[in-house]
Amino acid sequence: MLPHISADEAQPSMSRKVYINPNFQLQGQTAHQLPFQVPFQAFQAPLQPQPAIHINPHFLNRQRAMYDQYQREQQEQLMMQQVSASHYRLDPTIHLLATPPPPPAKIISKVSTCLVRKPSVVASGPAVKLAASVPVPTVSSLVQPPLVSISKRKIVRQGALKAAPAVAALHPPPPAKRTRYKLVRSISLTCTPLVKKRRPLREFVGQYALRRTNEAQPNRKLSSKPQALKLGVNKSLSMVSIHGVMYKKISKNKITKLDASSSARVAKSESPRTLQRTLSGRTLFVSGNKFILDPSGCRLTRVSTSSTGATQSSVNRSILRRIDIGGLTYVASPKALNVFVRTSNHVSRAHLITAKQRSLTLLNKSLVKTNVPCAIFQKLGKCVAHSRGKCRKLHDKRQVAICVSFLRGECTKPKCLLSHNVTLEKMPVCRYYLRGVCVREDCPYLHKKLSSKTEICIDFVRGYCPLAAECNKRHEFSCPELERKGKCELPRCVFCKKSPSKRLAKVKSRPKLGSKPVAFTDTAKESSTADELPTSSRYFGSHKEPAEAILTRDDVEQKKPEAEDEDQKEAGAPCPRRRPQLGTLPSFIPLGGEEKL
């Protein structure tokens, strides 16, 4: 071997000589050998004289020993694949001849996570003769299959395959499966099952576990004990006990209370087999004493012991008058000995628990603070639910709607529930201000002008708007739905369904006037005569008679329309109200103090 020369050292002198073995051959290396390994050959003495270079004699022996060990490992691995592990024992005394390793198996499928090779076939050659003293291991017909899946953390083998006889090779090869890009002959289409074998449900395979598919399923041992027949339970008829009260389960999220009559009906409807099973009842142990509960669950009977003396002593030591089991209370019966009867205390206890939970819920709800005003209290000034303690909304007397009768000056109620406090939050917009004619300095109405297309403020309609003048909606007593849609669909709208006023009702009830108005002929004549009187005189001292006639004529004119109205009322003909004709009026109006002058 040449000495190693580093880059830091100086170059060797040119006087050194290098000798190369002329028998060195590269063709002897195979794919499975390492580059430093030399194929084993029988050591022969060189024909030529020994070179001047000295070679360590142990070097070749060490190389030969390494090669022998490698060949031995290859043979052992091959035998492990061919011979079953149960019949093979590794014997260090066996010395096999050095034979070249077989070529690697042909790759069938190669994927990024899976590598599949064709099963290796041992070539039939001359049998290896071993020493007579060395026992030959028996070779089984079962051949361990090669690895079919190699992943990062998991190795899976196929099931054990029996060596097929030589006659099987005469069968034609399985049909090939041709795809678009390749031809696969290793898959047998005739033997592949149509239905995949399902994994058992209770089998658990970890993420990094090794699972063998060739293991036979263990046979379950049949128990010699007689198996009791389990009766099917109808889930729709299942019962639930809540605080000792039985409930029947109707659906998944709904139960109903089961009465005593219905429970007896259910007991009668049971099958005879179930009745025979439940006639004996259940056995309970309470404080060391044995009791039997009847099927109805209403009677608890104590089972007496064999010796009567022991029974009496135990009864005297511990006298049970009351037993509480599962929320139910049993009291000793005064008529029979060792019999306890169920009471209805569990029902009252359930009612008490329910009432307690309800009271706690109400108390917790009363502590909840809300700022939503009560619409009923704002509109009427009174809330019955609030007086009962059920309404949790805000009840503020400052937000009660203002009394409309108070604004007109007509409210005479001493205990009016509506507000008599005039504030801008409750007052509508001043109509005179909208026309521009409001001259009051302390006008209680709201002074702001908005477009007629603006929406009606709903808070103001309810009785109180906290924004007042800063609100961008109209404050008017009108229906918001009618202003928005043009029609109101509310059945009891205060603004749309107003009753007709009293004034319009009176107008409709009044009768019509006659078709021909009464002509005042007398008054017309008298007026003509009055016009003919001289106008030069300012006072009527010289003309007393015409003045008296004028006064009497005015009285007649006032009486005639009243008489006509009475006649028309008696006739009962309805007519709109009309103003009576005045006729010709006098030029001068006489005064009462003119006669004295």
Swiss-Prot record:
One of its GO terms (biological process) is regulation of mRNA export from nucleus. The keyword DNA repair does not apply. Required for the export of polyadenylated mRNAs from the nucleu; binds to polyadenylated mRNA, and is involved in the regulation of mRNA polyadenylation. It is found in: Nucleus. Keywords: Metal-binding, mRNA processing, mRNA transport, Nucleus, Repeat, RNA-binding, Transport, Zinc, Zinc-finger. One of its GO terms (cellular component) is nucleus. The gene is ZC3H3. This is Zinc finger CCCH domain-containing protein 3. It comes from Drosophila melanogaster. A zinc finger (C3H1-type) spans 397-423, 424-450, 451-478. Residues 515-597 are annotated as: Disordered. Residues 542-562 have a biased composition (Basic and acidic residues). Signal peptide: none annotated.
